[in-house]
Design a protein with these regions (language model features):
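Mid-to-C-terminal alpha-helical segments outside catalytic/metal-binding sites
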Residues: 1-9, 13-71, 99-107, 128-132, ...
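Short glycine-enriched loops at secondary-structure junctions
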Residues: 120, 175-179, 292-294
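Aromatic- and acidic-residue-enriched segments that line the glycan-binding/catalytic groove
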Residues: 15-28, 88-91, 157, 237-244
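Long, hydrophobic, well-ordered secondary-structure blocks that form the structural core
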Residues: 87-94, 102-163
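Divalent metal-dependent hydrolysis catalytic cores, especially in the metallo-beta-lactamase
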Residues: 41-52, 61-85, 111-119, 139-143
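Surface-exposed, active-site-proximal loop segments in enzymatic domains
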Residues: 77-93, 124, 186-189
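Catalytic pocket-lining loop regions of alpha/beta-barrel enzymes
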Residues: 130-287, 342-358
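Short acidic/His/Gly/Ser-rich catalytic and metal-binding motifs that mark active-site loops
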Residues: 81-83, 126, 179-186, 296-298
């Protein structure tokens, strides 16, 4: 059985000059000292000390071997998203990031699955960048869970998600730029409290806005960190949908009806929490995620899954790798759309598109 980790990060060795591509939008770059100590930088400011696996593929592969991980999906670090930049500059930045991620993963192409990033602040550009990245070899796309005040149920962003469904590109959604940060000034509370709330907000937004009704069911979508607080609070949302018309106004079905529209990773760090998550999502909707190589990640890859009560060997195998292999499996090539016949009913009525092909 191949163990597959769907949630890991990379930060290529961008120079200070390269980081200036995102002037006034974070300017991310990586400083590596003479002794090998790494520091993620935002302009001139130190952001976070980091370990070598974040930029050194040899170190990552050694850590994977030590942890029994066969394959990792490799995605950018959220500091690199660039959503605050002008869209054209952000697209150039994403092309550079995506090229560097491909270079990084080329050290072990059978073990490292590259995930691209896109300028999500401009959904049309995001579609173009995602299409280029997929053609270049990226196996999925990594996005933040919002762009400013635009959440995943924003019409433009749902259009991007629909595009990913049409081209068969899996989507990994990661919380970032956490709400309420002004009230969470210490103890990493934005990561401990804000991130789970962000993900819960994104999932419920897609459900209650009716967005899942508009996005093709073929979309492969995964939320990090076990879907945040969603599983624990599903009952609250379900009760509200049944009892308040303002909750169900835009959603024809209750929240529980959309559970089969997305996956979550296993990064909840407690077998009891994972058991609840599996009970809510089902064994085929949960995949191993470690958050490698950050300090808040799972140090024993798959340890929580192995310790989770009530799983048989087959179910553990699904969580440890089987589900991820299916999630990231290359989409079958789409058959060419038939050319519609033109007759007196269609001539002069404007363009004729195959299903799903309208711009």
């Amino acid at each position: 059985m191949t163990v597959v980790d769907v949630h890991s990060h990379v930060f290529p060795r961008f120079t200070r000059a390269e980081g200036r591509t995102l002037a006034d939008a974070g300017e991310p770059w990586l400083r590596v000292g003479p002794g090998g100590a790494g520091m993620m930088m935002s302009g001139d400011d130190e952001y976070r000390p980091v370990e070598a696996g974040l930029w050194d593929p040899a170190r990552r592969l050694a850590d994977m071997d030590a942890g029994g991980v066969g394959v990792q999906a490799v995605s950018s670090t959220p500091l690199m998203f660039g959503y605050l930049a002008e869209a054209g500059r952000a697209a150039d930045w994403c092309d550079l990031v995506n090229e560097r991620i491909l270079d990084y993963c080329a050290h072990a192409p059978d073990r490292l699955l590259p995930l691209c990033q896109v300028p999500l602040q401009d959904p049309d550009l995001a579609c173009a960048v995602a299409t280029r990245a997929a053609a270049a070899g990226h196996r999925g796309v990594h996005i933040g869970n919002h762009v400013g005040d635009r959440d995943l149920d924003d019409p433009g962003i749902t259009g991007f998600l629909a595009h990913c469904a049409r081209i068969g590109l899996p989507v990994l959604a990661h919380p970032w730029d956490m709400l309420g940060a002004e009230r969470m000034r210490g103890h990493m509370l934005p990561w401990l409290s804000g991130m789970p709330a962000e993900t819960q907000l994104s999932i419920l937004g897609l459900m209650l806005s009716g967005a899942f009704e508009r996005i093709p069911a073929s979309l492969r979508l995964c939320f990090c960190h076990g879907g945040g607080s969603f599983a624990f609070l599903l009952g609250r949302a379900e009760n509200a949908w049944h009892n308040r018309d303002i909750v169900r106004a835009d959603s024809p079905r209750p929240p529980s009806a959309y559970i089969d529209r997305f996956h979550v990773d296993s990064a909840v760090f407690d077998p009891r929490a994972l058991r609840l998550l599996i009970d809510v999502m089902g064994t085929e909707r949960v995949m191993l995620g470690t958050d490698y190589p950050f300090p808040l990640g799972e140090k024993d890859p798959g340890g929580t899954i192995r310790a989770c009560p009530g799983l048989d060997d087959g179910e553990r195998a699904l969580l440890l790798g089987g589900n991820a292999m299916a999630f990231f499996a290359p989409a079958p090539a789409a058959a060419p759309a038939p050319t519609p016949a033109l007759d007196s009913e269609t001539v002069g009525t404007g363009p004729v598109y195959a299903e799903g092909g309208a711009p």
